[in-house]
UniProtKB/Swiss-Prot annotation:
TM regions (residue ranges): 31-51, 66-86, 108-128, 148-168
Species per Swiss-Prot/TrEMBL record: Sorghum bicolor (Sorghum)
Protein name: CASP-like protein UU-1
Segments on the Extracellular face: 52-65, 129-147
Subunit description: Homodimer and heterodimers.
Gene Ontology, cellular component aspect: plasma membrane
Record's keyword annotation contains Transmembrane helix: yes
The organism's place on the tree of life at top rank: Eukaryota
Localization of this protein: Cell membrane
Membrane side Cytoplasmic: residue ranges: 1-30, 87-107, 169-181
């Protein structure tokens, strides 16, 4: 006579759940790495586009160093690109760390703030604000403004990729559905 205990049944279910979690973890790691590499590429491209952006007209050369917000944009995008690359490389070791989500949130907020600040300055440059004495200058420096718009679009892509990666770091794996009885 064999007697089956409840604890034996739970052990079998737990083992199956652990195997399902490992399988979900591999897909989770691949997705996280892909998102972080996308954020790396977009942040790096946005920073490089702005850092190399310059236009000369009538003896006046416009560069990103003329505006503090663009300097901050470049610095933050380089920092976010470095963070994205480091976390993409070490994601298998970091996926279980609780502080990863907090750092991801910090990075998302930095990316959002730098993109919003640069976008606000770009908006004033594009359309101006005549009551305050700011005139639209993008008619004169069209190439500079177009490259700035491209870098803002790239930074927004990085922001979205960081946001999704941050969500995945908060909920690293979905629990398997309960077994039917």
């Amino acid at each position: 006579m064999t007697m089956e205990l409840e604890s034996q049944e739970v052990v079998v279910e737990t083992t199956t759940a652990a195997a399902a979690a490992r399988a979900a973890s591999a897909a989770h790691v691949r997705t996280t790495v892909a998102l972080r590499l996308l954020a790396f590429a977009a942040s790096l491209a946005a920073a490089v586009v702005v850092a190399t952006n310059r236009q000369e007209r009538w003896g006046i050369t416009v560069t990103f160093k003329m505006f503090a917000v663009w300097e901050a944009f470049v610095a933050i995008n380089f920092a976010c690109a470095a963070y994205a690359l480091l976390t993409a490389v070490f994601v298998k070791k970091l996926v279980s760390k609780h502080w990863l989500h907090h750092m991801d949130q910090f990075t998302v907020n930095l990316q959002a703030a730098s993109t919003a600040g640069a976008g606000a300055v770009g908006s004033v440059a594009m359309w101006g604000n005549e009551p305050s004495g700011w005139y639209a200058v993008c008619r004169l420096y069209r190439l500079y403004c177009d490259r700035g718009a491209v870098s803002l679009a790239l930074a927004f892509v990085a922001f979205v990729a960081f946001g999704v990666a941050s969500s995945l770091s908060r909920y690293p794996r979905a629990p398997p559905p309960p077994a039917p009885r």
